[in-house]
Amino acid sequence: MAQRLHLLLLLFLICFVNLISFSSQQDLSFIYNGFNQDQTNLNLDGSAKFLQDGLLQLTNATTQQKGHAFFNRPFEFGSASSQSPSFSTHFVCALVPKPGVDGGHGIAFVLSSSMDLTQADPTQYLGLFNISTNGSPSSHLLAIELDTVQSAEFDDRDKNHVGIDENSLQSVESASASYYSDKEGKNKSLKLLSGDPIQVWIDYEDTLLNVTLAPLKTQKPSKPLLSITINLTAIFPDRKAFIGFSAATGSLISYQYILGWSFSRNRALLQSLDISKLPTVPRPKKPEKTSPLLIVLLIILAIIVMVVVGGFYLYRRKKYAEVREPWEKPYGPLRYSYKSLYKATRGFNKDGRLGRGGFGEVYKGTLPILGDIAVKRLSHDAEQGMKQFVAEVVTMGSLQHKNLVPLLGYCRRKGELLLVSKYMEGGSVDQYLFHGDKPPLSWSQRVSILRDIASALCYLHTGASQVVLHRDIKASNVMLNGNLQGFLGDFGMARFDDHGSNLSATAAVGTIGYMALELTSTGTSTRTDVYAFGAFMLEVTCGRRPFDPAMPVEKRHLVKWVCECWREGSLVNAVDTRLRGKFVPGEVEMVLKLGLLCTSIIPEARPNMEQVVQYINRHQRLPEFSPNTPGIGVSTPVLMGLPSLAITSSSVTSSVSGPSASPSSANNSMFISHTIIYGDGR
């Protein structure tokens, strides 16, 4: 009897404890209509703080900051045998930019296994992860982000989006910020970084997660912005998580606030926020108004400047009118009027500037019949050699190959030459390799581009009526169309850049890292182009410039470093890390070895472009050679500055006779000069 009594008592205690536990889980419900009362249950860190008017400020106008605010009791899901977890939350936030600057980075509602996110980074990591924890299942974190900066590394769709992040900032679901208007029956865009309060509802039930947005005084829309199935218990095996907010700034800053917050395990029991009780969002002060007297003085000064500039413009227009000479009559169909090019480029507006290089600036334009074009403006003060140069430009325009950028014509003014070519909407290869505004190229795209340029260069060497040496093959001179097909461009500038003088075949011309050793002694030939193409192959495969003075000494010369990787039996380690291992190892090894063969310092050891085309298309196998073969993997002395050159860069200057060099703003490589030569250069 006593034993049975003990068992009943034990069973009662177990049921009582479970009931208390279940009750505590059911009781996790709260509401904050502003945060000026009962702040004890909220844990803040970083830049987060409560303001006197009841606002919860997560970040201020300081760079590289992060702020967190968590409810100090965990949201517990219960045992594995209990019902599936569910919750609903409603909060109002505001992201306020500083006047005159772009704001960032964003704010997120967070479920985390820990309130301690102090090891997370600000900027694009939003105070949620760092480089080592991002993407790790051990992070145990689910976030709904309101992101105002587009980060290419996380495949963000734009700089005004909402995303659902599961242990990673690469969202499993995202959409541009908007809300469904039940009145109009369609989605309406919503600017996150407007400074206006935004309502956010997050509902989770039966593994379905819904995220809904709306302006402040709008009822909850009937359709969510995001809806996705999420297994919350898989993210949080311990079946509990802390709930709260995270926000961050980087070099872009903004004030990020939470005005009110309501949470409940049961959507039906979720208390609605009282909009009338929410604090007002402060607006940063705008600069004080300029005094009327100063405005009048500025207007008078502007009028004077306009008169002076207008007079100077008329003077310049008369003095530098378009130049036409009798010998240009045969080229009439290829001659464009300056007025048409001026209108096509909207007056060479800086907004249409595509780039700036060692020879001049390139602008995008539109002609009625041809459509989009690229116009390159070149300054030139000498008339000597102009006739021969224009003749060469026209001849270059007659070259026909599918992978050459078509040269359409020219325009000539006193002191200026304008070259018109087809516009390539894909930009240049170096923009994909070295600039964050373009997505990384896949391996198949890179190989296809290399094959395109090899075909074009083979045509210049063997397919034209005369041998054409490009002499400046590099990533910034390889253009792409909308389908990412490669086109070799930016040729025909040599004689003009040398101020009309007759070019010597022994002149050392090109860009640092692409120049063959023999340029300063025996001069140019098709094999010097082969060397530059080999450097370009390595550049595209490795995602590194052929010569980078900022790298450690052992990695400064790409040719030497790739050969060293081969010597150590790890050739594929030289591949661009942005490929993330998605490449064909055998094909990569073939391309890298071919690049090393083309950059041999022994000209006779290099293949010609016909052979290169056969090798890169896998029609022939590469000849047998090793990293210890003479001439392979040797960095050329011209990169260090030979006595016959005068190379000027931000770090090296040599005041000796020879062609001068200047840094190219197009690709930050040291450019010496650039030519095309017709004749027997095979």
Curated annotation (Swiss-Prot):
**From which lineage does this chain's organism come?**
Eukaryota, Viridiplantae, Streptophyta, Embryophyta, Tracheophyta
User: Which ranges does the record list as Cytoplasmic topological domains?
Assistant: 314-682
Question: What would be the name of the gene that encodes this protein?
Answer: LECRK11
Q: Which UniProt keywords apply?
A: ATP-binding, Cell membrane, Glycoprotein, Kinase, Lectin, Membrane, Nucleotide-binding, Plant defense, Receptor, Serine/threonine-protein kinase, Signal, Transferase, Transmembrane, Transmembrane helix
Q: What does this protein do?
A: Involved in resistance response to the pathogenic fungus Alternaria brassicicola.
Q: What is this protein called?
A: Putative L-type lectin-domain containing receptor kinase I.1
Provide the Protein kinase domain boundaries. 348-622
Q: What is its EC number?
A: 2.7.11.1
**Is-annotated flag, keyword Signal?**
yes
- Per the record, the major location class is membrane
Which residues of this chain are annotated as glycosylation sites? 60, 130, 187, 210, 231
Q: Name one GO cellular component term.
A: plasma membrane
